[in-house]
């Protein structure tokens, strides 16, 4: 398994390689290397404008083809039945063997045909819409004129232009009885514009108009967007030519379609019959046009994604070739890139395959070159370890050959989550969720998922381990939905005389975790708080100590005398400082646990307190402790305090002095011409290769680093108390939900209330504990690893290894 390989502890050893590829074999060579995904090419033309590179025309050509494919895909997605036939991703489609010239010609033909069909269909749809709207205008107007026959057929009468044509209290029938002949404009507009349209008419005509409207029941299809639009028929009555021109302009500004409607009922009836016949004929033509378009798109669908895959890979190949240097004399391309050392043979095999495939007479050549640049960082992961590696990478990419925190994170991250979320019941529900995601792995892998589903699916194995550790720690806490599990039988008996619980066997305890009798005891919180708080301190000291040990592994990987200096002036004093104070406190905690200071015998004494002991260690060094854990405690505490204090100047002063000495020795070697390679490595690490050595800058940096560690040792240890705080919050919330929501309803004896209470309890547990509380525990575990653990050793200033890979390119495009 990959997590047992050395490449997961440290990044894979990388090698800079140089490729000499004949121009006729370049395309096939890049294609074969893309299938491997083992080389990260460098840009040898970074000072050349993108539009002046050798293969820019080929890239533009691929861009044009991609635009046409995007046009085809948009047309297909407008047809729901055809859209269902599209594959989920391009990785699963079969490669297309067609040549680019052939595809380009095919795309031009299809694009021209589809655009012509769309133009014809848009014209037909617009004409069809016009006829549909005219039919509704004739129908609605006929109904209105039948209700008011005298409105446009009466004799003209004088009417003041200064007063409204229709006052608010004057109905249209009254106007008809007066025999006033009015002009009218009728048309159709979007329904959502009608209120504003009517207000504009009223203000412009000063009320000298009358508007009648009716909603068209069927939806009108917009010929440009293809979406259905709600339309309304309107008719505006007015008096005078000047108002007619104003009303027409308002109608045009609102995008209304105006129709000439005869004022004679016989003419309206004849026109309606003609329009109905034309609608029937045009509908048949429109359907044939749509069928032709569907047939054209149906021929595109099976090959669309294979075409997209072909064009996308071709574009990536030419884009990669633009990174290469072109040797005009040799007519070859020269490429540089990083690759893992153990993969060079696979690359050479791919080069030979590409040479044979292209028919080139001169084989491609791979040469290994040396460089002072820092290589990219590459860790070999699988689907199980990749999620944990991404957790680390989110903080920062490891420096080249730096110890990888993900090795320990695979275990410690879910474990610390379990410490905060420890509950057998909730952990089991979380486990079911994780197993469900894992079981759907093959079905969901590679598909486009909702963001809320994608995140837990990507972290399904992290979720799986978190649930297992939650169950494990839940057994330690002896909590299942906040209630204890008396699996092995309590070790306490109730003494009927004293009314107190006593041990059945003084030489034996509850086999696994906390005795169930502690749950519900008067001093339950006191006991659990003490246990979890001390446990948090121990976990914190141990994890920070492992972090300092990881820094030792980083120092051992260095070359030259700086290795010994870092070990003696960084690792040793840091470990001494941490364990002289907080390590000693952890030892006292364990000592207090294992030593039977108090029993139910009269002659036993109360256990000593740890906090006053640590405070007295600093305030009264060398004095006799008031609280004694063991003989010779005063001398031990004095020695530990001395070691902690002396370690600070060791971290602060000694390393800058050694670095200054190494710098002068390096200068002398350069003068004598004996500058060895390991000193290049040393200078690379110290950051002063080819730079003037500044003692003040180095000393200030060391002061900052020392202060950060000393203060961080205190604050980081206190930060681990969040393990206790979140565990307490989870336990108390779970207990409240159980007792108040579920048990409170069950005790009422009403089955319906019990059912409702169970539903409310389950909903609250899922929403608050499984979602909100688990997210909170996840974020706190993330903080403990990124800050408290990784700042002891992790530089995190590396560069990710991103090789040219066809699989990665296709996957990113699918996203």
UniProtKB/Swiss-Prot annotation:
Keywords: Cytoplasmic vesicle, Endosome, Hydrogen ion transport, Ion transport, Lysosome, Membrane, Transmembrane, Transmembrane helix, Transport, Vacuole. Its main location: membrane. Pfam families: V_ATPase_I. It is a multi-pass membrane protein. One of its GO terms (biological process) is regulation of intracellular pH. The V-ATPase is a heteromultimeric enzyme. One of its GO terms (molecular function) is proton-transporting ATPase activity, rotational mechanism. The gene is vatM. It is found in: Cytoplasmic vesicle membrane; Endosome membrane; Vacuole membrane; Lysosome membrane. Residues 422-423, 485-530, 593-639, 732-749 are vacuolar. This is Vacuolar proton translocating ATPase 100 kDa subunit. Belongs to the V-ATPase 116 kDa subunit family. Disulfide bonds: none annotated. Residues 1-402, 441-454, 551-571, 660-706, 789-815 are cytoplasmic. The chain crosses the membrane at residues 403-421, 424-440, 455-484, 531-550, 572-592, 640-659, 707-731, 750-788. It comes from the Eukaryota. Essential component of the vacuolar proton pump (V-ATPase), a multimeric enzyme that catalyzes the translocation of protons across the membranes. Required for assembly and activity of the V-ATPase. Required in both the contractile vacuole system and the endosomal/lysosomal system. Also required for cytosolic pH regulation. GO terms for cellular component: contractile vacuolar membrane; early phagosome; endocytic vesicle; endosome membrane; lysosomal membrane; lysosome; pathogen-containing vacuole; phagocytic vesicle. Disruption phenotype: Cells show defects in V-ATPase enzyme assembly, endocytic function and cytosolic pH regulation.
